[in-house]
Amino acid sequence: KDLVILEDEVRESSDELIIMTDDGSYGEKGVVTVGIEKFINQEEHVDKVFAIGPPIMMKFCCLMAQKYNIPVEVSLNTIMVDGTGMCGACRLSIGGKTKFVCIDGPEFDGSLVDWDEMFKRMGTFRDAEREEMEHYEEHLRGVEKKTDVCGCQTCMDVEPTNESIEQLIDRDAEWRKELRAAMKPAERKAIERVQMPELDPVYRATTRTEEVNKGLTKEMAIREAHRCLDCGKPACVEGCPVNINIPSFIKNIERGQFLAAAKVLKNTSALPAVCGRVCPQEKQCESKCIHLKMNEPAVAIGYLERFAADFERESGNIAVPDMAPKNGIKVAVVGSGPSGLSFAGDMAKKGYEVHVFEALHEIGGVLKYGIPEFRLPNRIVDVEIENLKKMGVEFTTDCIVGKTITTDQLEAEGYKGIFVGSGAGLPNFMGIKGENALNIMSSNEYLTRVNLMDAANPLTDTPINVGKSVLVVGGGNT
């Protein structure tokens, strides 16, 4: 029964549902073709048979339908691989002609499919798959033996932690004491600060959409985490605008509990993967690091924050932070930029019903239209937004508060609070002669066209002028 899927949905849209299992443990006993023949014999007329499932099952469904001269349509999506036809795995003979399932299908007339050829093609990958699986298992065994910088077995966790947030941030927890005792402060200070791997400069010049900073490896992150002295009064926390418990998430990285580190981050920050990339840590948390007082580089807090958030995302175990019970109070947020999203996340964790209103067609504000892909990929932002949705935050796009809907209307709809995070959408010109001439653009306009509207792509219809000589006024990040 556990292998039967979509039963309720199929039953709801069908006049009759027959379930067949080989051993009769659920539904009727017998293979699918037995059920088909039984149904055909009890009906006056059957127009068509549709078969979706394992290829061998679809073949015999076709043979059964042909026995009664009933047309049959099969879906061969089970043999598709890359979806482009380039790999050739789904190349088949359909009615004597070469077809690609992912391009020409996946639905075909079952009577035209050369099933024997199909099974042969599928069989050609069997030995290769078995060999690759052996290589993969060998790789896993190698990972299990891998050790970290201090020589102990590395706990490369991929399962969500069962420890509470209180246990993960407790400086007096036994695991935390053991970490402090394992290395002397002088040994930690002797470790050089990690260098973030970057794209090759020559290759970087050929792409504007690939992230320049490649992120830390597990080994690099653990080594950098060893540099943290786990101060009793951590000044780095005071330097963080949202007061992340920085030593706690770093120490969880040091012991190899990367998902636990992400949990600590998300207890305070709604956008750890974003902040790990674009926050000016050198002016905030890292500027308070005790290493600087000893004329040593600060702990790479931003790199480690990004690592923990990226590890959680890539592991597939994206967790929702601890949530307070719903209090029934509605709060509106104007703007879906970093301030709006952060506020929305904080209020959702406190139990409020949060609704974000965004003027543009995409959520993210400056994270989407202002920061280039090579520094902050949109896919990273989208994952953070999706996590907010899982927390219960609702979003409405193409809605200008004040025009599409007024604040009075929001209050009438029951919103008890309105947070305005509209950002700096309008540019500030200098008021000099000629600044309104053609081909002079504010940074807001340029970045919106290039980042959000993909103007640099010749296939899009968003206009942008490319000059031989370009003057840039301003030397900041923009």
Enumerate the language-model features and the residues they cover:
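Residue-level detector of alpha-helix initiation sites
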Residues: 55-56, 86, 270, 337-338, ...
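Ferredoxin-type iron-sulfur electron-transfer modules and their immediate structural context
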Residues: 30, 55, 105-106, 114-327, ...
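Rossmann-like dinucleotide/flavin-binding elements
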Residues: 226, 233, 332-357, 396-407, ...
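Glycine-rich FAD pyrophosphate-binding loop
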Residues: 352-368
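FNR/FR-type flavoprotein reductase catalytic core
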Residues: 1-81
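Short, flexible loop segments at boundaries between secondary-structure elements
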Residues: 2, 71-89, 445-457
